[in-house]
Amino acid sequence: MGMSSLKLLKYVLFFFNLLFWICGCCILGFGIYLLIHNNFGVLFHNLPSLTLGNVFVIVGSIIMVVAFLGCMGSIKENKCLLMSFFILLLIILLAEVTLAILLFVYEQKLNEYVAKGLTDSIHRYHSDNSTKAAWDSIQSFLQCCGINGTSDWTSGPPASCPSDRKVEGCYAKARLWFHSNFLYIGIITICVCVIEVLGMSFALTLNCQIDKTSQTIGL
């Protein structure tokens, strides 16, 4: 009974982490694609690392490393790797909770910081081709103009702005999109946390099962 339970747990955790690792590869690949083809980061000279591509590359890399430890620890029944996997997942979970709290506490300050970065980038629109391309992409995609409206463009709105003079600003449009999709974002976040907790539970259970099996066969 002990050996069959051990095998079941081992393969469940292995395939769980294999799927986790594949997801990490996809996220990393998408992040690299964004870094190559997406130039929105030029809008934030005050926070140059604030790009979706950088975030996806970092998250994808971390997921791949953690999932690799989980795969190797489960298939080799290595308690050291399993505990490393557990600790890393725990750190990631705590980091996510901390980040959520910080975003909630400093939401206003972050909004001001982002708004300042966008305001500075508007002044570079006619002198920097990358900034121009980024703004044109955002305004065309969101059907918005400037940060708060057409008045942000002192020399007149560019061609990428919608023709409607009462069009919304891109900052308000982006915030509206976020709030309208808040439920889905919340569900995805909760699912990720549940998966992490399940991974930690599987790792601990397998670790305990290895001990029990070792004692049973007299190792």
From Swiss-Prot:
A Pfam cross-reference name: Tetraspanin
Extracellular side: 33-54, 107-181
Tissue specificity field: B-cells, monocytes, macrophages, neutrophils, single (CD4 or CD8) positive thymocytes and peripheral T-cells.
Superkingdom of the source species: Eukaryota
Residues on Cytoplasmic side: 1-11, 70-80, 207-219
Topological relation to the membrane, as annotated: Multi-pass membrane protein
Record-level GO cellular component terms: cell-cell junction; extracellular exosome; immunological synapse; plasma membrane; specific granule membrane; synapse; tertiary granule membrane
Gene3D superfamilies tied to this protein: Tetraspanin (1.10.1450.10)
Carbohydrate-modified residues: 129, 148
Keyword NAD recorded: no
GO BP annotations, alphabetical order: positive regulation of myoblast fusion; receptor clustering; signal transduction
Subcellular location: Cell membrane; Cell junction; Membrane; Synapse
Name this polypeptide is given: Leukocyte surface antigen CD53
Protein source organism: Homo sapiens
Designated gene of the protein: CD53
